[in-house]
């Protein structure tokens, strides 16, 4: 079990508050490493739920001069992240910074944002390794840590109550640690090692007459397997692989975008032939 210092450092300190245009919630810092291209700066990444920052993603159909057709493109607006500094159990300061969405997946309800604040973040969450997921058991202790009703971060404890809940064809963990609106995007942490299992994303409600009762003890977080699927599909392996880095990940993402446009062009032309990427250079706005 985690001691008092570990509970602070692994469960509480990595949690942030997230504010978008029309929504708010929580986030979890998962990466803070020196920026190899900018001395004395760090690259800081937080995870949150896609529905928390959904207003920051604008989908528009625009004419693409390369493939000569209208193409749906996403345009990112910035969200605001509040990072908290602590003196033991007390908040010493709350620092607001803008952040840019670098990846999102509506299906998994997950997104990754890069903070504009480049100072080192000493406390980041550790995502549960893939080979540890199968060891999870009912009654395992968990902590839900987030900004309930957009309050400053705090944690509540409970246990795992269901290991594979299927909701709308998606897998979740269920837990009985109390959670409420505003916890979305906050962390659900394993209580023995402090691993980040998933992000709080759903709670149970029941309608009684004209009112809605919230079952705060029936919370759901993205299944940890889906966290790893998101990381792999979005080319964000640097979040869990020390041999990878942010800039390599962004290059892979840009290459996939370009390849997708090329394949769309040749499919539209009735030509499935593979092409050399060097033959078709596509200029795009790069991720922050």
Segments (PLM) and residue ranges:
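Short, conserved beta-turn/loop elements at beta-strand boundaries and strand-helix junctions
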Residues: 23, 32-35, 104-107, 163-169
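Catalytic nucleophile loop of clan PA
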Residues: 28-31, 178-201
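Short, surface-exposed secondary-structure boundary micro-motifs
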Residues: 49-51, 147, 193, 202
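Flexible, gly/ser-rich surface segments that form the specificity/activation loops bordering the active-site cleft
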Residues: 100-103, 123-173, 179-184, 200-215
């Amino acid at each position: 079990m985690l001691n008092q210092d570990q509970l602070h450092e692994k469960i509480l300190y990595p949690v942030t508050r997230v504010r978008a245009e029309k929504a708010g919630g929580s986030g979890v810092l998962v990466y803070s490493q020196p920026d190899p291209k900018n001395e004395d700066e760090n690259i800081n990444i937080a995870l949150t739920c896609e529905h928390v920052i959904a207003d920051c993603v604008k989908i528009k159909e625009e004419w693409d001069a390369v493939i000569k057709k209208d193409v749906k493109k996403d345009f990112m607006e910035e969200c605001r992240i509040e990072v908290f500094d602590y003196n033991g159990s007390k908040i010493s300061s709350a620092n607001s910074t803008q952040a840019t969405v670098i990846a999102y997946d509506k299906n998994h309800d997950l997104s990754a944002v890069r903070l504009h604040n480049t100072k080192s973040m000493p406390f980041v969450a550790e995502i549960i390794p893939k080979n540890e997921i199968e060891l999870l058991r009912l009654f395992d202790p968990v902590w839900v840590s987030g900004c309930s009703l957009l309050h400053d971060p705090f944690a509540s404890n409970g246990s795992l109550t269901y290991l594979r809940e299927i909701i709308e064809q998606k897998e979740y963990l269920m837990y009985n640690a109390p959670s409420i609106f505003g916890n979305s995007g906050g962390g659900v942490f394993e209580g023995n090692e402090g691993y980040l299992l998933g992000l709080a994303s759903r709670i149970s409600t029941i309608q009684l007459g004209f009112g809605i009762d919230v079952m705060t003890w029936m919370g759901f977080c993205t299944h940890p397997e889906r966290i790893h699927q998101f990381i792999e599909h979005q080319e964000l392996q640097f979040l869990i692989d020390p041999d990878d880095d942010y800039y390599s990940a962004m290059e892979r993402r840009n290459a996939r975008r370009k390849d997708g446009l090329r394949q769309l062009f040749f499919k539209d032309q009735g030509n499935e032939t593979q092409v050399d990427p060097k033959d078709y250079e596509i200029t795009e706005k790069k991720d922050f």
